[in-house]
Amino acid sequence: MKKAIMGKKIGMTQIFNEAGKVIPVTVVEAGPCVVVQKKTVEKDGYEAIQVGFGDIREKLVNKPAKGHFEKAGVVLKRTLKEFRLEDVSQYEVGQEIKADVFEIGDKIDVSGVSKGKGFQGVIKRWNQQRGPMTHGSKFKRAPGSMGASSDPSRTFKNKRMPGHMGCVNTTVMNLEVVKVIAEKNLLLIKGGIPGPNKGTVVIRNAVKA
């Protein structure tokens, strides 16, 4: 069965397993999320649920969004996300989805917006090799050749060059849930996940597990 939830990245720490081995984990406050809309094949052509996460002040929400939440009879939420499922009959509008939908040992994919790094050169952005740092070298961290001269007289599209780095949607796949603290809606996930602390992340079943 497909499972999905939104959450807030708290930060990283470490725990010990039964053998005394250190496991680096990311703590995520997963939910509670609320079902705002339920879509069916008969009405919408596909099955999905629309889920809201995170509180927001009323003055920051526009009229169409307010009407959408009022129709569902739920409080205003900061983030809306739609999850496609095979069967939405087990969900109802207004129902809460909490961290206990996942269990210890579940394989998951975590998506989020990566940390922004600003304008970066080709060495940091694309892991290119630098030039010699001594003996009169005139290129140390420079990009090098961007293409031929008279033919084709242009730089090809998708040439790796300096530019804005980070702040893009990123997914880390096949992570493992090592602990679930249901009463606090916390998931402890083995390894690192995208984005800064307090950033919103989406947790789904692993598609390649």
Swiss-Prot record:
The keyword Lyase does not apply. GO terms for cellular component: cytosolic large ribosomal subunit. It comes from the Bacteria. GO terms for biological process: translation. Keywords: Ribonucleoprotein, Ribosomal protein, RNA-binding, rRNA-binding. GO terms for molecular function: rRNA binding; structural constituent of ribosome. Residues 130-162 are annotated as: Disordered. The keyword GTP-binding does not apply. Belongs to the universal ribosomal protein uL3 family. Part of the 50S ribosomal subunit. Forms a cluster with proteins L14 and L19. One of the primary rRNA binding proteins, it binds directly near the 3'-end of the 23S rRNA, where it nucleates assembly of the 50S subunit. This is Large ribosomal subunit protein uL3. It comes from Clostridium botulinum (strain Eklund 17B / Type B). The gene is rplC.
